[in-house]
């Protein structure tokens, strides 16, 4: 695999994806970020088995491929690179070479085939809602959202679309009626 991206695009995508990398896990592959350049776009995927994030990065694919790299090490390398184009190249043993101007880093990688993939989500027609309406919906339920992130699912709100109607659900964790 060989891809070329700007540092700013890489850093933005990696920092977003880093939110789904667990700090402690019994599965080392979950500490990785999957770089997938097997199609015509570059995808970064992270997954902690509760939360999964996929970002698409603008860049050039010179050789198609896929590799899983340690997400925190990869982020620290990208963060310290000069503001220029970054080349990421892997060999047949999944070792990655990251170069930017005079900087060159070699880090071991893993096969992307071992990575825990995200489920496919059908993306139908987009829903348009006014900012005022969305703000009011969130304002009316924000009090019930968990403050700590022991369970990440409880720190958000669920929006469902059924029969052209928007259903808004907030899981009451702090404020429950008994």
Predicted regions and their residues:
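Structural preference for solvent-exposed beta-strand-turn elements
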Residues: 1-166, 170, 174
């Amino acid at each position: 695999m060989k891809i070329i991206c700007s540092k700013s695009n890489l850093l933005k995508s990696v920092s977003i994806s880093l939110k789904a990398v667990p700090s402690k896990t019994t599965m080392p592959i979950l500490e990785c970020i999957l770089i997938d350049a097997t199609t015509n776009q570059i995808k970064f995927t992270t997954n902690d088995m509760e939360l999964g994030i996929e970002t698409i990065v603008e860049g050039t694919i010179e050789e198609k491929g896929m590799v899983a790299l340690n997400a925190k090490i990869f982020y620290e390398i990208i963060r310290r690179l000069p503001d220029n184009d970054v080349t990421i190249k892997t060999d047949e043993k999944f070792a990655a070479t990251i170069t930017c101007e005079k900087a060159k880093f070699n880090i071991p990688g893993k096969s992307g085939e071992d990575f825990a993939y995200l489920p496919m989500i059908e993306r139908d027609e987009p829903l348009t809602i006014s900012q005022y309406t969305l703000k009011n919906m969130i304002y009316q339920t924000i009090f019930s959202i968990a403050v700590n992130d022991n369970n990440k699912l409880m720190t958000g709100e669920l929006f469902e679309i059924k029969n052209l109607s928007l259903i808004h659900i907030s899981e009451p964790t702090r404020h429950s009626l008994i």
